[in-house]
Each structure stands twice: as C-alpha cells, then as structure tokens.
Amino acid sequence: MGRILNRTVLMTLLVVTMAGTAFSGSFNEEFDLTWGEHRGKIFSGGKMLSLSLDRVSGSGFKSKKEYLFGRIDMQLKLVAGNSAGTVTAYYLSSEGPTHDEIDFEFLGNETGKPYVLHTNVFAQGKGNREQQFYLWFDPTKNFHTYSLVWRPQHIIFMVDNVPIRVFNNAEQLGVPFPKNQPMKIYSSLWNADDWATRGGLVKTDWSKAPFTAYYRGFNAAACTVSSGSSFCDPKFKSSFTNGESQVANELNAYGRRRLRWVQKYFMIYDYCSDLKRFPQGFPPECRKSRV
C-alpha cells in the first residue's frame, strides 16, 4: 500500500524540497525486472534495458528507490514497425486504492501511422485527466528523452526537453495533487488491443512478435524516501531549492512558446476541452491549465 507520510516527515521533506539526488547509473543498480521472465533484459554492462512482448506475455520493471519530487529522465526507443495494439508505459506511481500516478503511455499503431502519446495524472486514486499527443518525430528510429518534472507547484511532461503538458497544483480549488506519497518508477510493455489503437478496432498482429522497446540514459535528480526519511544530495540544492526561480527557468518565455506550439499542432485530445464528457462544466483544475 502507498505510504502517506506523517506531517513531521512531510514538513521535513518540504524544507529540503527539490534538493535533489542524481542517479545516472546502471540499470542493474537502479531497477528490478519484475515480470515477463526472459522478456526483460539488462545488457551492455547495465547501460541498456529492453522489454519485449509476445503472445504469451509482456514484461516490465520498476525502480528500487522511491521518489518524492524531482526530475526523472529516461531515453526510449519504441517498438518499430506494426506496433498496433501494444502499449509501452513509463510512469511514476505509489501503491494502493488511493495511489498517485503520473503517466506516459505510448499507444502503438499500424506501420506508417503515428504513435499516440497518452498522458494522465492520478491523485488519491482519481485520474481521468487525459491529454494525448502525436510526436513531431518517429519515436522508433532513435532514442528520445521523456521527462517528468514533479514539484509541489506543478507537474511538467517533457519530450526532448520540450514541455508538452503542465498540470498545476489546484488544491485551493479542492483538486487533489500528488505530493504526499512517494512513488517508484515503472515501465511495462503489454498487449492492449481491446482499446489502444483506434479504440480497439486494430488488433495486435502476432506474426510480428516479439515486439521490443529499448531504454537507456536514466537520470533522476530527486529526493528519495526510505523508511519515512529522505535523502537529498546537497550538491543539487542550488538548482532545486530556488523555488519559484527554478519554476521560471523550467517554463521561461521560450519554454512557454514551445508548450503552446506542441499543444496547438500536436495535441489531439484534452479532457479540459471535451464538452461531450463534461456537459455540466469542466473540472475545476481546467481553470488553471493555461501557462
């Protein structure tokens, strides 16, 4: 079950908010392969990881450490060719029915058709905050960096250091925000052909299996939590304890322009614009969705 830190521990963590610890090491040291038997592999001296999916099973891994606020970077190269029906998920999550979660999900497609990048935020077990995007490149040709920046003020989703989505803390409007539960990093490759591609109309072509996604370049500048206490490396204090100034650096004028560019040309779904879904009015956090 996901732990909710007591008030004393939480206040201690917030005092050192974002005095981060950077981990840019071996997948062997930082992650456990959790399911899929031989379908998950760590190789190249711990610098590379792959997940595979076949008709029998997918595969997945999770971090050994738990994090509470920080920036998580991972380079991925997604399943090439006909990836319809497959989902590559990369996300932060706590455990239990009132869990918090911050999601990247890459929904596969038929050969020559674009992946859909699905994002979502869960707080206290409630999600339904989806935004979806096409990418401005082919994510199967090369590695690209997908980042989650998690702060008490907001969550930023980034692709190759370009912000694509900002989820602001709207607790003053009664909207829960992920800030109390430490989360681990998870990733999995699995079959979801009942919904992933065109709402389930396109099924997985098992003649193309195994499907494989590749990972490298993991980095975490974050606070880790263990047994109710936190560890943050002081050498990152200057970049993570500056509060609003650091937030401004992440979303400076150029970053805001890039965010608007992505949302204008590549966003294909936004729950904050779905009148059919919310005929009585949009969720309250949608009022704070613009940057």
UniProtKB/Swiss-Prot annotation:
The keyword Cytoplasm does not apply. Residues 1-24 form the signal peptide. CDD domains: GH16_XET. Keywords: Apoplast, Cell wall, Cell wall biogenesis/degradation, Disulfide bond, Glycoprotein, Glycosidase, Hydrolase, Secreted, Signal, Transferase. Glycans are attached at residue 109. Pfam families: Glyco_hydro_16, XET_C. Belongs to the glycosyl hydrolase 16 family. XTH group 2 subfamily. This is Probable xyloglucan endotransglucosylase/hydrolase protein 16. It comes from Arabidopsis thaliana (Mouse-ear cress).
